[in-house]
């Protein structure tokens, strides 16, 4: 990420919604790209690969800001370790002690793959195709796709799963039954 990006963009404009934080961050990253409006295949590929490499940091740092400012948790920022996988880095950056097990990393890695490969006809893919067809820049396209993930009929379903799990934990005393 650009110098001071985490401090100036993510931490100073934290919010209650991680998807909004990530969308804002993606749009802001476009202002750092001198080739923002170059829609050649080679440039778009470069931009997409760069964004793919930055998404884990945007998610983790957005969550850390939310956790600190909205939930009054301690603030700590861990930089990624280039010798680790994406899943390992996410777990390492999320935890105060940076510790995780190989099993946790494997489970997260599989979950990430499943989320990426769940089908080609979903809302975010459709949104990406529509906005791309207008000739828009990569950052605007990705921000639009992120916005489509937020709705309760798409990515918002994950929020409903979290709410259901909290409700089950609260109301089911013996989970082994």
At which residue positions do the language-model features occur?
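Hydrophobic alpha-helical bundle cores within soluble ligand-binding/oligomerization subdomains
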Residues: 1-177
């Amino acid at each position: 990420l650009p110098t001071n990006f985490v401090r100036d963009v993510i931490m100073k404009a934290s919010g209650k919604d991680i998807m909004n934080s990530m969308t804002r961050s993606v749009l802001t990253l476009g202002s750092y790209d001198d080739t923002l409006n170059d829609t050649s295949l080679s440039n778009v590929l470069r931009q997409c690969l760069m964004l793919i490499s930055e998404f884990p940091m945007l998610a983790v740092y957005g969550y850390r800001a939310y956790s600190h400012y909205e939930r009054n948790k301690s603030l700590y920022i861990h930089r990624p370790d280039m010798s680790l996988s994406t899943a390992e880095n996410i777990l390492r950056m999320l935890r105060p002690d940076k510790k995780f097990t190989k099993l946790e990393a494997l489970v997260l890695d599989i979950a990430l793959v499943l989320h990426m490969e769940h089908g080609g006809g979903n809302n975010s893919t459709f949104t990406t195709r529509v906005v791309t067809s207008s000739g828009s820049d990569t950052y605007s396209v990705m921000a639009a796709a992120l916005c489509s993930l937020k709705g309760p009929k798409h990515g918002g379903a994950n929020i409903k799963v979290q709410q259901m799990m909290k409700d089950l934990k609260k109301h089911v005393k013996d989970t082994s039954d």
